[in-house]
């Protein structure tokens, strides 16, 4: 005998009813429907709406969202590296003059505005913006050394995050690698020998941004190779534009000493420098090529330049950051605002959250820059591993654990977010 149909009182709610019951969650309706369907399949007679809400909350946490970085890593790659200031999203839409010449009304170049400002900031004749530093290196080598040799010291055949390897970039560019010197010692005469014996069109100097070779070592400076007769490309990576840091009232911080910069590399004789926009430069993800105008022109005319060109949002953000440099307004660049906060200032903030948990900490630059560097900082220390608890907050708070103690470093937390940390700690007490 067939089962009797469920009465209206016993029937489970429809998928649409479940989705509408959890519509207070900030998700598009189709995703709420997905959560409802999955909940029905899992419910087994339980509270299907509560199950749908749990699933929807998990879905919500897979989307891109704001987080609070309390790790003390200033340029945290997993959290987008350098934070940038976003203009109000509530303003009405507008177009931009990205490729419009307002004087003639004709089509212009998207590179003219931001690139000219960047060139001015780092003392270059010209500059070109692409979508990341790997693209910058690839484009330069493809445009200037295709089917020819590029001399690189064996100590600088680096791999950074994401599997970016200099030898593989050279292979993709159409150039071929000419290894020079040894892992720990490379001299000028090694480059002379390589140039004499091979069809070398470029010397590529690569900054050891995420590791150090110490002990019995020797490197060849850019200034020692300027008379070798071929262009020198300096991939400084980290994006410091001027070692003197004229945008900082007290000059460069001690932890920055020794970091190569765009301006000083060019002054030393580099023909081109390449670096990231979202590291020490403090802007959006981008690759910047700066140097001699004739070489930049060759890069801009190469077909790859179209492939790796950035969009209007990137160019606009870069323009804003570069103007802040030119006007020497470090407070307008979030990275430098964080990096120059004093320990005393951080301790005052920590005391307002909880005097019980105040502790000294050590922040780090991160982002594959300045390996081994620690920056004196302050924050909060709680006994036990609470990283998952903090990560489940709204907004999520990302912190670190060491020896079963949870650390929240305030150097990387915007002061306006202290209240969220305060509220989360109160839940633990």
Question: Model-derived features: where do they sit?
Answer:
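Conserved C-terminal alpha-helix-loop-beta "cap" of PLP-dependent enzymes
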Residues: 347-421
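Catalytic, metal-anchored helix/loop core of enzyme active sites in primary metabolism
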Residues: 51, 76, 99-103, 404, ...
């Amino acid at each position: 005998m067939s089962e009797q149909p469920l009465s209206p009182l016993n029937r489970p709610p429809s998928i649409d009813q479940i989705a509408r019951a959890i519509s207070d969650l900030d998700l598009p309706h189709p995703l709420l429907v997905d959560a409802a369907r999955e909940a029905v399949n899992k419910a087994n007679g339980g509270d299907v709406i509560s199950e749908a809400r749990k699933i929807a909350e998990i879905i919500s946490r897979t989307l891109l969202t704001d987080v609070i970085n309390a790790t003390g890593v200033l340029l945290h790659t997993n959290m987008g590296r350098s934070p940038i200031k976003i203009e109000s999203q509530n303003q009405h839409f507008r177009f931009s003059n990205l490729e419009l010449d307002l004087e003639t009304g004709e089509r212009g170049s998207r590179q003219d505005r931001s690139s000219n400002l960047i060139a001015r900031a780092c003392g270059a004749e010209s500059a070109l913006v692409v979508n990341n530093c790997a693209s910058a290196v690839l484009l330069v080598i493809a445009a200037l050394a295709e089917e020819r040799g590029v001399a690189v010291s064996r100590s600088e055949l680096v791999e950074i995050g994401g599997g970016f390897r200099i030898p593989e970039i050279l292979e993709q560019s159409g150039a071929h690698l000419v290894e020079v010197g040894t892992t720990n010692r490379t001299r000028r005469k090694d480059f002379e020998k390589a140039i004499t014996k091979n069809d070398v069109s470029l010397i590529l100097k690569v900054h050891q941004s995420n590791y150090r070779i110490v002990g019995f070592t020797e490197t060849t400076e850019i200034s020692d190779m300027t008379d070798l007769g071929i262009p020198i490309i300096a991939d400084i990576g980290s994006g410091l534009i001027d070692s003197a840091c004229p945008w900082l009232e007290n000059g460069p911080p001690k932890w920055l000493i020794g970091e190569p910069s765009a301006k000083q590399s060019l002054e030393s004789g580099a023909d081109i420098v390449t670096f990231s926009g979202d590291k020490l430069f403090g802007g959006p993800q981008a690759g910047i090529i700066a140097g001699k105008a004739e070489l930049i022109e060759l890069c801009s005319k190469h077909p790859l330049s179209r492939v790796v060109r950035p969009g209007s949002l990137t160019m606009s953000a870069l323009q804003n950051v570069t103007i802040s440099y030119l006007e020497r307004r470090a407070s307008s660049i979030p990275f430098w605002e964080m990096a120059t906060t004093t320990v005393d200032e951080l301790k005052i903030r920590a005391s307002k959250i909880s005097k019980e948990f105040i502790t000294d900490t050590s922040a780090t630059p991160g982002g594959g820059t300045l390996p081994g560097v620690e920056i004196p900082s302050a924050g909060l220390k709680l006994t036990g591993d609470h990283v998952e608890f903090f990560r489940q907050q709204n907004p999520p708070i990302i912190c670190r654990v060491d020896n079963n103690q949870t650390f929240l470093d305030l150097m990387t937390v915007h002061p306006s977010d202290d209240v969220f940390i305060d509220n989360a700690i109160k839940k633990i007490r």
